[in-house]
From Swiss-Prot:
This is SMC5-SMC6 complex localization factor protein 1. The gene is Slf1. Widely expressed. Expressed in testis. Expressed in spermatocytes. It comes from the Eukaryota. Residues 283-303 are annotated as: Disordered. Gene3D superfamilies: Ankyrin repeat-containing domain, BRCT domain. GO terms for molecular function: protein-containing complex binding; ubiquitin protein ligase binding. It is found in: Nucleus; Cytoplasm; Cytoplasm, Cytoskeleton, Microtubule organizing center, Centrosome. BRCT domains are necessary for its targeting to ionizing radiation-induced nuclear foci. The keyword Repeat applies. Residues 407-1054 are annotated as: NSE5-like domain. It comes from Mus musculus (Mouse).
Amino acid sequence: MEDSATKHIIQMTGFKMEEKEALVKLLLKLDCTFIKSEKYKNCTHLIAERLCKSEKFLAACAAGKWVLTKDYIIHSAKSGRWLDETTYEWGYKIEKDSHYSPQMQSAPKRWREELKRTGAPGAFHRWKVVLLVRADKRSDSLVRVLEAGKANVILPKNSPSGITHVIASNARISAEREQENFKAPFYPIQYLGDFLLEKEIQNDEHSQISPAWTKYNNQEKGNDVGFPEMKGAGENMYRTQNKMENHNKNVSDRFVLSEHHKKKFKDFRKDIRSVKKRNTLRRHGLENQKETKKKDKNIQRSYILRKKNKKEGYCKTDDAHDTIRSMLKKRGHYREQKEMKNPLLTDGTKESKTKDVKTNMNLIEIKNALKKQIYKDIYRAQAVRYNCIRVDKQPVYNVEVKNSEFPRGILNLIENLIEGQFFKEAIEELSSLQAHYIPPVCLLHAILENVLQDKIDTFSGRYFHILSALLHLHPPWKSPAMLKYYLELFQCPTCMKGAWDFTEVLIRSCLFNEDFCHQISENISTKVVNLTLLKFFFNLLEGEVRHLSQKLCDWSDSQSLKVTEKAILHEIFWSGSETSGLLTKPVNMLLEWTIYSHKEKCKSNDVFKHELSYLLTGILGAAVDYWIFLGIQMGRNVIRHMSDDLGSYISLSCDDFSSKELEIFICSFSSSWLQMFVAEAIFKKLCLQGPTSTCTEPLSLQKIIDSYLPILGKMDIHGAGKMQSPKKLCQRPCLESQRALLMLNGAKRKQAEGRPELLELNRAKCSSSLKKLKKKSEELSCSKENCPSLVTKMNFHKTNLKGETALHRVCIKNQVEKLIILLSLPGIDINVKDNAGWTPLHEACNYGNTECVQEILQRCPEVDLLTQVDGVTPLHDALSNGHVEIGKLLLQRGGPELLQQRNSKGELPLDYVLSPKDKEELFAITNIDDTVDNFHAKTQKHFYHQQLEFGSFLLSRMLINFCSIFDLSSEFILAFKGLGHLNELLMACNSDTEASNAHTDWLLDVYARNIKTLKKLPSVLKELPENLNVCPGVHTEALLVTLKMMCQSITELS
């Protein structure tokens, strides 16, 4: 591979003759060598018109060359020098709607970075290839591609042993296989293109680095150790999206019964039911299964994953059930199997026997056994979820560390290598000793400091492999000493201010482009290094949560387990103190960054922003899950804490999200708890008005079925009208979270008084001004070059206390000249928002400044006409204040979609127009072949369906995640049928003997309510609101399918 400092040698592919000649003329302005040839030569940069499988394109990928777009030449020629290639490389950005796969889009970048990282000479450097192709132009082209990738191409007659690939046409492959001339595998000709552009890169280079890496890779066998390599951003983004989609799919399908599942239940009841009754139930179950498969194939498909992970857990559940039965039998309340209708207690127990139970039964012993089983169910469900997220198994730490202290001689050697900037040799020495010694923090910090200064760009990937192997071999939960080691390691090597400060600096540098805590290189690769460090941090925290979940799942005595060891999560987010409060300062900051990163992700297709958003949501999910696991173990009612604190906080912070953005945001959480409580908080804000008894109760299955489901059924009648209280006429609404700030700043809006008079006044004013507007605009455009002092005086990035920029202020004051000058400045953002969320276009529409609106629409094609605050768009602002002419301008640009937008009170823009004539004129601009009334009726119906769909999505998230978290599957129903009756006895005992500690049994109460709700679910389904059955939405249908599957499980077991 060529060094980036050498002279540029350029080749082109895929261009038509005219375009190619134009690019060649631009190359004459730059210092380079252009090779005009149809064959691939040893170039340094290939300029490709499009993604393809041409000889040059494949050869450049195989050789790890820069494969760039034509913009690289155009922009470099304008600058008079060669620019940095990174942002012009094919694979820098992945297009979602492209007909090319993400692997093909990212192939040039992936291969270049992989070969640069490993030091391999080419993609085929270990291949010994025999080509069985007719000698023609095509075979010559194949040879050039193979030789570019450093393959050893051998003639068929001189074929020695050790051939790795035989490439031939399909017909030749069959003939040669019959003759058995070659023992190597055969491949078709198109395999080369598929290997380079469509296949994942197989990382077999690590064995060349050092003996330690050989051992390490043999243990892993290609699995992800827990820390992704620094591959192309496109590949990372594709993997990120697949993780999210697979996670959401697995979580969404918890109630589908597989053959293995049903067999477990039938075997469990074999000693209770007679053979005749068992066969009857089996036939009934098979019939239901056929019907279920016919209707819901997609939902049933992913439940197979769950049965594999829970197979071992079922055996433990059976043992726990036997323990509970033995306790009951010991007390004389275990009936004969022929008389039993359920495994634990009979629901129809007489009142006289209830008194005997209260007198004779050891309630404390049974209560503890039940709580122990409930804990196991919860922790097993969480362990299964984490195993589904990451396919690699929990590592076994069987590597023996001879001595935690490095030999002094080796330590001095590596220090001298680093000081002499022999980084490759220093990293190789560390790698070779890593299996037997823990690398000293000082050495890792010394290398990291040079990585941050961009001095080790070529070998930075190997450094992160050392960190990855360190986490695999010596995790922080291995011992308290290792925890201290990681806390010392994960901090800035220069400032040494601690792990949280380092995490904050990394996030801010990636999210806001803020300066590092000390002076570092400003190269673009430094930002990638910061993101890679965040990946390591994320894998570190996720590993801790997985370890805690597995430990709690394996624990056998619920009364004796005490999680005493600390964790990095504990030290960073709760400063090592008591975790009674969830929302500490670090957690609050992480919440704000996560929400902000999601907003930025929704605005662009930048792979870097998407990857950063994924990491932040993952870190937040790990922190929340850790806090919840510890809280449940300590008997804390985490449901009430989460619902009151976290869910409400996030729902307020996401006030300006659209329903689609909220769906994506909720599904992006890896934590089922986060999904559930954020969905509930948004549902309450959307559908409930004011504080009610329903709002104050913690989330439960009973609350979802008895309270939220009927409310959802009435949404087609009430819509979203309950979201906020009515406001005064024409007064702008504002976010509740911003209202206090606006009152403090004295923000007042210009309001219309006496609407009919104002309409006539504005119409007369606008009609006269519009005639002169074009001429005046042209004059101002010509004179703006003569006003440099005006530009100097205006700092368009500066904001006042209300968050208003110079754009906001000139639109409020109708200063058209200054507006034109500002819009001509580079980097100006016409969609910038103040503290309340208003844009400059909002201000111009609200104040009736028609000329400003005209200039914005004319000069800013990127202006967002659908931007809103509590649903108030610029069109709402204009028409609510009587500015009809501005409304016409907006509709000419935005079309009928603007008329379909509703504010928080459910009002459409035309609802503000009282004059029928004005309303007809505004409606006519959209060229809709319909009447205003019919259009509004259709819009109303569509709006209610959207609201119902979004409500169904939120309710589905609550229901599926709640049942997943508390493991409300069929075996639970079978084993704990009598829990409701038993819990009444326990609560009665608690009221007498443990009144002060009644809150510690909140889990028993939750499970008792769950069973009670599940038993009446079939009757609830028969009385579902009609609109839920007729709504065609996907989320509504998914909600109904989930409820029906739950109901079917209960019916089969009754």
